[in-house]
């Protein structure tokens, strides 16, 4: 049995076509899968909300409360957001794979309630459904504009950039001359 429903408490009525959640119920066991859909306009928030360079800096950002959006910010899907902020980051590459497909989009991770442990079986669970939901955006600017429109405080996490240094193997194969009982010291090799 497949049911589709719209998460109306997470977005404003103008953006209800963006986030669709589908829940699949298999024999009493429920599995929820979420996806983001930008069907009307691929860049809906960038043209409406102005994002400055200060908004894109790494660190915590507080959005000024608007009386019209206070109810959206304080409650989201039945979860209280008092003082909590969302994380905006670019996911890192999986260490088991060499591909970078899932590292190109920016992700908004919503805060969730702590999990509890069932001591008998050792299961970890939570009644919070927001830990299953990640919103993906094409750019950091779109993600920040979305948070500013909804009125959520956000925290931009710094990107992990790996710099590859050129490896030098030539010092291993150079002629060292005749070594008679002396150890040669390799000098100036980085």
From Swiss-Prot:
Domain of life of the organism encoding this protein: Eukaryota
GO molecular function, one term: NADH dehydrogenase (ubiquinone) activity
Matches recorded under Pfam families: NDUS4
Keyword check for Membrane: yes
One GO cellular component, as annotated: mitochondrion
Family, similarity comment: Belongs to the complex I NDUFS4 subunit family.
PANTHER family (alphabetical): NADH DEHYDROGENASE [UBIQUINONE] IRON-SULFUR PROTEIN 4, MITOCHONDRIAL, NADH-UBIQUINONE OXIDOREDUCTASE
Name of this protein: NADH dehydrogenase [ubiquinone] iron-sulfur protein 4, mitochondrial
Species name: Dictyostelium discoideum (Social amoeba)
């Amino acid at each position: 049995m497949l049911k589709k429903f719209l998460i109306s408490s997470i977005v404003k009525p103008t953006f209800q076509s963006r986030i669709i959640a589908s829940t699949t119920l298999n024999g009493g066991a429920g599995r929820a899968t979420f996806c983001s859909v930008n069907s009307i306009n691929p860049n809906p928030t960038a043209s409406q909300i102005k994002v400055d360079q200060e908004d894109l800096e790494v660190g915590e950002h507080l959005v000024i409360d608007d009386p019209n959006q206070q109810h959206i910010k304080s409650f989201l899907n039945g979860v209280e957001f008092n003082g909590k902020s969302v994380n905006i980051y670019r996911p890192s590459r999986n260490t088991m794979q060499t591909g970078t497909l899932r590292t190109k989009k920016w992700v908004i991770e919503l805060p969730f309630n702590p999990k509890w442990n069932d001591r008998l079986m050792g299961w970890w669970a939570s009644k919070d459904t927001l830990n299953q939901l990640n919103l993906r955006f094409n750019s950091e600017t779109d993600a920040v504009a979305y948070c500013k429109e909804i009125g959520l405080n956000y925290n931009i996490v710094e990107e992990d950039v790996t710099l590859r240094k050129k490896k030098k193997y030539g010092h291993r194969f150079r002629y060292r001359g005749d070594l008679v009982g002396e150890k040669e010291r390799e000098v100036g090799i980085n």
